[in-house]
Amino acid sequence: MVMAAKKGPGPGGGVGGSKAEAEAASEVWCRRVRELGGCSQAGNRHCFECAQRGVTYVDITVGSFVCTTCSGLLRGLNPPHRVKSISMTTFTEPEVLFLQSRGNEVCRKIWLGLFDARTSLIPDSRDPQKVKEFLQEKYEKKRWYVPPEQVKGPSYSKGSVSATPVQGSVPEGKPIRTLLGDPVPSLSDPASTSSQPGSQSQARSSSQARSSQPPSHSSTKKASTDLLADIGGDPFAAPQVVPAFASFPGFGVGQTPAHGGFANFDAFSSSPSSSTFGSLPPSVQAPFQAQPTPAGSGQMSAFGVAPLAAASQPNNLADVGGLLGPRMAAGGLPGSVFGMPSQVPALQSAVPGVSGSGGLPFGAYTNPFATPAQAQLPSTNPFQPNGLASGPGFGMSSVRPGLLQPVPPSGAFASPFSAPVFPTQAGLADQQNGSSFGDLGTSKLGQRPLSQPAGISTNPFMTGSSAFASKPPTTNPFL
C-alpha cells in the first residue's frame, strides 16, 4: 500500500516523500565520504598531491582526497579534474562507491606506480608553480601511470608500493629488527620472554665482569707509569761518598788514611806481595809522618819524608803525600815508584835556630816541596851555585828531596835493586846517598865526606862538573 501511494500521482504526497528520502540518502553518503576522509588506513588524512594534513576536497576524477590549494590546481589542468567539497556538497551513491574503491593509497599505486625517488623529486608544497608542473607530469603526461587492472585488489605487490614514494603520507612502520639489529628479543612472544632471563643474566654477568676489569687495568697502568716507585731511599738524603777516581787493583791496594780531601789513589800503593813496581809495604802512618829506621836501611820514599818526632796536622796536600809515599819496614832495600831516599835519624833543620834532628823543616810548616839542608851549610839558592858537598837540592839530596826526581828513560821502573846506589856519608849515619833513578843496580860510587867541598851545584837550572856528569841528561818537568 505504501509503495503504491508513493508511485501514484497523488496530489503533493509522492514528490515530497521522495525528496525527503533523497536528502536522507544524500546525508548518508556525505557522512560516508567524511568517514573515508578520516580513514587513516587508506592514507586519506593527508593530501594526495602535497601531503598536507587535513583534507577538504575530493577529486572525483581520480578518486583521491586533496587539500584546498591542490583542488584549485587540479581544476586548472587539461582536462580539468572534477573536485567536490567534503562538507558543502552532496555525493551520489556511485561517487561514494568510486571513492571507496580508490582512495589515496590506490591512486598512489596507479598514478605514481613508476615513480623513482632516485631520479625524480616531489616538489615543495610552498612553491605552487613546481607543484603545478608536477601535476601536469603526473596526470596529463601520465609519466608514472600504471593501469588500474594491474593494481586492483590485494594482488598488488609490495615491491611496487615501496618503489613509489608517498608525498605527505604517514611513513610505514619499520620492524624493530631493522632498527635495532638482528639480536633483538621478541617483545610479544611469551615463550621467548620466559627463556630470556637466563640469557639476560649471562649478559648481565659478562657486563659486570667487563665493568670490573677497568679498575684492574687502571691499577696496572698506574703501576707501570710510576717510574720512581722502585727507587729506594730518601731523595733528599746526602749521597754516599764515592771516590773521585777508581781504584786500580792491578798495582796492589794498600791501606791509606781515609780523608775526604782527595780521592783514593790506591794505584800507587801496594801490599807486600810482588807488583809492577816492586814490593812496597802498606802505609799506616799519617801523611808526612816518618818513623826512624835503623842505620843502613835502604828504604826509599816518594817524597823523601823527613824524620819527625811528632806528626803534623794532616791537610789536603798532606793526603797526597801520604797516598803517594808508602812506607816500608826496616831491612827492605826496594824503593818506591820514584825511589827517593827515606828518613834519616840524624837529619837537621834547614832553618837556623831550630833543632837539627826531629824538628820540622821551616818551623811547624811542612812544605812537601821544600829542600831541607844541614844547619851548618849555607842556604841553597836555586839561582846561584854553592859548595854543598851533599847532593843536588832537587831530588838528589841525601837528606830528603823536596820535589820529584826526573825519570830517566832507562831503568825508571825496573825491579828492586840489590845494592845501595850511593854509599853512606860520614855525617848521615850510613844513609844511602843518591837518587833511585840513576842507573839502578850499578856499582857503588866512592864515599864522599859531608864537609868535602865539591863542584856539585844544587841549582837545577845550572850545570856543573860533578861525579854525576856521566849520567844521562835530566828530564825534570819543572825545567
From Swiss-Prot:
A zinc finger (C4-type) spans 47-70. Transmembrane segments: none annotated. Signal peptide: none annotated. Residues 150-223, 450-479 are annotated as: Disordered. Keywords: Acetylation, Metal-binding, Repeat, Zinc, Zinc-finger. Residues 194-218 have a biased composition (Low complexity). Residues 157-167, 454-479 have a biased composition (Polar residues). Residues 27-153 form the Arf-GAP domain. Interacts with EPS15R. This is Arf-GAP domain and FG repeat-containing protein 2. It comes from Mus musculus (Mouse). The lineage of its organism: Eukaryota, Metazoa, Chordata, Craniata, Vertebrata.
